Amino acid sequence: MKQLAFVFMMVLVFGVANAQQKISWSYSAKKLPNNKYEIHIVATPPPGWHIYSQLTPDGGPVPTTFKFSKNALVVVQSKMNEKGKVVSYFDKNFKVDVKYFEGKADFVQVVTVKGNIKTNISGEVESMICNDRTCMPPSTEKFNIALN
């Protein structure tokens, strides 16, 4: 019975610890001239954890990636920019140069709305967080941002 209680306690402790290691996401759209919007998708990892850049090479950790859903009223312009404190180093485990964000990462995408109408842009972001000892499995977050 003591062993069963111990196993239950360990599952509970690790389950709670893992549940707390999630990225907090926030989304906003800033109106620009000529029906353009600057989309901000901000990732805030838990203290002591970091999120990887979109520019992580093959063979490295899972890069942050964005997939925008099709919307006939919205044109996604060029590539998404990244803002934040970037740390670059050679990762001995992956044997590649990696980039991650220390603290918040602001991913910025410019879009154009066809016409002067209200619509939205939706999609999903896949990311992975790590600390100096371990990584969490990649996770996917859906988003929907109003453009009005």
Cite the ranges covered by each PLM segment.
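Bacterial Sec-dependent N-terminal signal peptides
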Residues: 1-22
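Extracellular/lumen-exposed scaffold segments
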Residues: 20-148
